[in-house]
Amino acid sequence: MSECGCFSATTMLRICVVLIICLHMCCASSDCTSHDDPVSQDEAEKATKLKLGSIALLLVAGGVGVSLPLIGKRIPALQPENDIFFMVKAFAAGVILCTGFVHILPDAFERLSSPCLEDTTAGKFPFAGFVAMLSAMGTLMIDTFATGYYKRQHFSNNHGSKQVNVVVDEEEHAGHVHIHTHASHGHTHGSTELIRRRIVSQVLEIGIVVHSVIIGISLGASQSIDTIKPLMAALSFHQFFEGLGLGGCISLADMKSKSTVLMATFFSVTAPLGIGIGLGMSSGLGYRKESKEAIMVEGMLNAASAGILIYMSLVDLLATDFMNPRLQSNLWLHLAAYLSLVLGAGSMSLLAIWA
């Protein structure tokens, strides 16, 4: 059984590179709106210093956010068998759900409803909702097909050994047949659940990473100090809470230390990397955020990212946990989990005022 389940770090890196190339194609495109007022040299230098500071700030915020749940695995109170664990997962799911609905999807609708696209196909069709729907359906296909593939592979690999055990036990004592078959079933169920958690964590990371690169490039390409300052603070909290949600899913995947560190690092560096790319584009590559190409690419990517996050939060995180018999049999734990969900979604919603 592959430890990574569906995607490797190399695959994620390739997706990130393709994303950067798509946005790079938006460089040197003509604006469909009037150009911004020229920025003075002094103001440009101050903006550059703020952007460099934001790289360090977002790196720390994202790193701390994604690391807390991973470190928390070593804390007894946060072990899977404890009630607090359900509350932490509900909070993380609320953060991810809000990110998709409140932060990303509205941005996609705004970009793809731009007056600049009125004379294009995008201006005559609700592409934001359409792409988000396709993205959610695609995530469902990846989720189910990948889980089914590894489940069938696991059954195939263990079928032979199971038959041998049955024959031997029948020769020795008939009562042993049921016991070994039941244990094998439990092991298979546990392995399938673990594979599913790994697939969930990696597909979820792809959706978050796409959004992180886009917001990083937007900040890096901005030349307004009045815009950069509030964005620095808001995006720091944004990365921290997104990191909490992703870190919680990675911790459940129970992967090797190397894979866990790679996934946490990959998330932490994407927003700072996006800022660096945006900084380079605004400095010498002629990036125009309001060109038709940039608007369409950003809108489509945001819509796809929103579809992934909404599906994953509702289906793979919330539905799974809130249908858990342990949660449903404990009224106070059930209410506490809902409260955590509301707090997670509410905290992330407040950031939409500034970010």
UniProtKB/Swiss-Prot annotation:
It comes from the Eukaryota. Mediates zinc uptake from the rhizosphere. May also transport copper and cadmium ions. It is found in: Cell membrane. Residues 1-28 form the signal peptide. This is Zinc transporter 1. Induction: By zinc starvation. Pfam families: Zip. The gene is ZIP1. GO terms for molecular function: zinc ion transmembrane transporter activity. The chain crosses the membrane at residues 52-72, 84-104, 125-145, 199-219, 230-250, 261-281, 295-315, 335-355. One of its GO terms (cellular component) is plasma membrane. Residues 73-83, 146-198, 251-260, 316-334 are cytoplasmic. Keywords: Cell membrane, Ion transport, Membrane, Signal, Transmembrane, Transmembrane helix, Transport, Zinc, Zinc transport. Belongs to the ZIP transporter (TC 2.A.5) family. It comes from Arabidopsis thaliana (Mouse-ear cress).
